[in-house]
Swiss-Prot record:
Signal peptide (from-to): 1-14
GO biological process, one term: polysaccharide biosynthetic process
Phenotype caused by lack of the gene: Cells lacking this gene display a non-mucoid phenotype, indicating that they have a reduced abundance of polysaccharides relative to the wild-type strain. More precisely, mutational interruption of the gumI gene leads to accumulation of GlcA-beta-1,2-Man-alpha-1,3-Glc-beta-1,4-Glc-PP-polyisoprenyl (GlcA-Man-Glc2-PP-Pol), and a decrease in xanthan production of more than 95%.
Principal place of residence: membrane
Species of provenance: Xanthomonas campestris pv. campestris
Keyword Signal: yes
GO molecular function term, any single one: beta-1,4-mannosyltransferase activity
Catalytic activity annotation: beta-D-GlcA-(1->2)-alpha-D-Man-(1->3)-beta-D-Glc-(1->4)-alpha-D-Glc-di-trans,octa-cis-undecaprenyl diphosphate + GDP-alpha-D-mannose = beta-D-Man-(1->4)-beta-D-GlcA-(1->2)-alpha-D-Man-(1->3)-beta-D-Glc-(1->4)-alpha-D-Glc-di-trans,octa-cis-undecaprenyl diphosphate + GDP + H(+)
One Pfam family per UniProt: Glyco_trans_1_4
Superkingdom of the source species: Bacteria
Membrane-spanning residues: none
pH dependence: Optimum pH is around 8. Activity decreases below pH 7.5 and above pH 9.5.
Lineage: Bacteria, Pseudomonadati, Pseudomonadota, Gammaproteobacteria, Lysobacterales
Name by which UniProt lists this protein: GDP-mannose:glycolipid 4-beta-D-mannosyltransferase
Length: 349
């Protein structure tokens, strides 16, 4: 059953106060802006608390809201992983015994990496305890017992006060954490095969592995058109890098929800991405000329023709992101929490 997020947002006069424990740490300068903006958007009736295992095991709260639950189960060391998984099992027993509802946001259809049978078993247990799911795009399959649709918010306000660069003609950009599934190795190979002298490629982000770092550094050394900033970058730097490009290129091997795509659109930059049901829905939502979708292989023939296609495409001054405003998103999360508790969710609207 899917709850629509299309109702008008108003503040209820007597909204029930609830305490929500989030599975993430207290926001800081390095926190994912999606999370920071969500916490800021929650209405006053929601008292947020942030995760520590001690807090989760020993304190009282009305709802546990999980984002990326696999990260509660992982540690760089084997013993650390076992300890975290044992603590997580205790937490799940507590939730089951107390009847504390779990709300879970579906950022990915499945974790990007498989870390073994214990993690898989604990994630299945979490799934069984989840009272209400939040999907952040309307193409994600619904899950029982209830799934609410609350679209991923934009980053327009987040970057509004940050300096932006003058666009560099022909600049292509790939940014974000550099992981194998994002196809950066294919992008580098294709760029070397492209003969168009107008094009240059910029890679910005922190490599997930030493092998990924070496791959990008080697490509930069072999082709003067390719440059990179291989580090975690603060948002002001990211705003300048994104605004400097003509096109953001995301040749992901798999793509369902992408904060990177929405970040690029929030800074009014066109994006090239693989066709998927979710990407096609975003392309329709934001208007023509902003999201360019390809099917099949990502190759030199595709990339060679993109610059002229992007320049020729009619588009408005900015993509339409009105369905992704944060005040609305905060109220809709409050409604989900109330309904997970068996209360009237309309009190939130």
């Amino acid at each position: 059953m899917s709850a629509s997020a299309s109702l008008p947002v108003t503040r209820a006069a007597a909204a029930p106060r609830i305490t929500v424990l989030f599975s993430t740490e207290k926001p800081n300068a390095n926190t994912n802006p999606y999370l920071t903006q969500l916490y800021d958007a929650l209405p006053d009736a929601v008292q947020p608390r942030f995760f520590s295992m001690r807090e989760a095991l020993l304190s009282r709260y009305d709802v546990l809201h999980l984002h990326w639950p696999e990260y509660l189960l992982r540690h760089p060391s084997k013993m650390g992983t076992l300890a975290k998984q044992a603590c997580a099992a205790l937490l799940l027993m507590k939730l089951q015994l107390t009847g504390t509802p779990v709300v879970r946001t579906l950022h990915n259809l499945a974790p990007h990496e498989d870390r073994g049978w214990r993690e898989r078993a604990l994630l299945r247990w979490i799934d069984q305890l989840t009272r209400r799911w939040i999907r952040i795009n309307a193409t994600t399959p619904v899950r029982p017992p209830f799934t609410d649709t609350i679209l991923h918010g934009h980053y327009r306000d987040w970057f509004a006060t940050m300096e932006q660069s003058t666009t560099l003609p022909g600049r292509l950009l790939h940014f974000g954490l550099i992981r194998p599934y994002k196809g950066v190795e294919v992008l580098l190979d294709v760029m070397r095969d492209v003969q168009d002298p107008r094009l240059s490629l910029r890679i910005v982000g922190n490599p997930a592995t030493p092998x990924m770092r070496t791959l990008v550094e080697t490509a930069c050394a072999q082709d003067a058109r390719i440059s990179a900033l291989l580090a975690y970058v603060e948002e002001p730097v990211l705003a300048r890098e994104v605004s400097a490009c003509e096109l953001v290129v995301l040749p992901y091997k798999q793509m369902h929800n992408s904060g990177t795509l929405l970040l690029a659109l929030s800074l009014a930059r066109p994006v090239l991405a693989p066709w998927s049901e979710s990407n096609a829905a975003i392309a329709d939502e934001v208007g023509p000329g902003w999201v360019f979708l390809y099917e099949g292989e990502f190759d030199a023939a595709l990339l060679s023709g993109m610059l002229d296609q992007v320049r020729a495409a009619p588009r408005g001054p900015a993509p339409d992101l009105s369905q992704r405003d944060w005040p609305r998103i905060g109220q809709l999360h409050y409604r989900t929490y109330l309904e997970a508790l068996g209360k009237d969710g309309d009190a939130a609207l």
